[in-house]
């Protein structure tokens, strides 16, 4: 069923003006990533991002919703003003589809790998080829090809899309629908990218950053990478 929904989305977008082939690259779901990045996947499953969709359910996060003037008893899982920041690829080819069976959408539920790194259909094969090249020939690959293909390296912008998208935001070009969870609701919503990304252990909102193997070389290198790699553990 999920393949049928994805195909329908692609067919529709193919007739929309201004939509290029590159923009039609599909979201693949987190399992396409964790087949290789299993250690990252395991720690992500315990994170707040993995459970983001659950917070839209009735009676979940009631205190926070009340402070933000939302109805804690309401089911927001189908609310188009909320869903986009709690699932992956909402409204995009291959992404989460409201109204579809959650069983079909299960690898797109929550803020997954592709929410930050971009639709895997654009660059997954390049990762596989580069890994094989390093393993078989001992050669590293240029990271620039990933940028050309569409992988996102501007992590801070990816975070700001939801965490700083409140009305009146001065740190992000906020656009409707705005998040109701602004700093005026509570200090915890004063999003700090550096602090959030550097958090380790049980409170990590994303996943543990493990030692990277040097499959790719060259720019761009996210500014936080060097710091994260200083004490990054080995993949399990």
Curated annotation (Swiss-Prot):
Note accompanying the cofactor annotation: Binds 4 heme groups per subunit.
Keywords, alphabetical: Electron transport, Heme, Iron, Metal-binding, Periplasm, Signal, Transport
UniProt cross-references to PROSITE patterns, sorted A to Z: MULTIHEME_CYTC
Coarse class of the protein's main subcellular location: periplasm
Residues the entry annotates as binding heme 4: 49, 159, 162-163
Keyword presence, Signal: yes
Keyword Iron: yes
Binding sites annotated in the UniProt record for heme 1: 33, 36-37, 127
Gene Ontology molecular function terms on file: metal ion binding
Uses in industry and biotechnology: Has potential use in bioremediation of waste sites contaminated with perchlorate, a common component of solid rocket fuel which is a widespread environmental contaminant in water systems in the United States.
Signal peptide start and end residues: 1-22
GO cellular component, one term: periplasmic space
Cofactor(s) for this UniProt protein: heme
Top-rank lineage group of the source organism: Bacteria
Localization per Swiss-Prot or TrEMBL: Periplasm
InterPro entries tied to this protein: Cyt_c-552/4 (IPR023155), Multihaem_cyt_sf (IPR036280), Multiheme_Cytochr_ET (IPR051829)
Function: Component of the perchlorate reductase that catalyzes the reduction of perchlorate to chlorite and allows anaerobic growth on perchlorate as the sole electron acceptor. The gamma subunit may be responsible for electron transfer to the beta subunit PcrB.
Subunit and partners: Heterotrimer of alpha, beta and gamma subunits.
Protein name from the UniProt record: Perchlorate reductase subunit gamma
């Amino acid at each position: 069923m999920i393949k049928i929904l994805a195909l329908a989305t692609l067919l529709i977008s193919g007739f929309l003006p201004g939509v290029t082939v590159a923009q039609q690259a599909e979201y693949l779901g987190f399992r396409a990533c964790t087949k290789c990045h299993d250690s990252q996947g395991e720690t992500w499953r315990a994170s707040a991002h993995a459970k983001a969709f659950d917070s839209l359910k009735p009676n979940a996060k009631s205190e926070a919703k009340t402070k933000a003037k939302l109805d804690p008893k309401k089911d927001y899982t189908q609310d188009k003003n909320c869903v986009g920041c709690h699932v992956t690829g909402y409204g995009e080819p291959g992404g989460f589809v409201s109204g579809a069976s959650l069983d079909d959408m299960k690898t797109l539920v929550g803020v997954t790998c592709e929410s930050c790194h971009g639709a895997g259909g654009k660059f997954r094969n390049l990762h596989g080829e580069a890994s094989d090249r390093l393993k078989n020939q001992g050669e590293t690959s240029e990271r620039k090809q990933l940028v050309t293909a569409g992988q996102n390296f501007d992590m801070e912008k990816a975070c700001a899309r939801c965490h700083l998208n409140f009305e009146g935001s001065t740190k992000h070009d906020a656009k409707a629908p705005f998040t109701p969870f602004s700093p005026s609701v509570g200090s915890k919503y004063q999003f700090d990218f550096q602090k959030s990304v550097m958090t380790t252990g049980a409170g990590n909102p994303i996943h543990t950053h493990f030692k990277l193997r040097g499959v790719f070389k060259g720019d761009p290198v996210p500014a936080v990478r060097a710091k994260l790699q200083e004490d990054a553990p080995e993949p399990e």
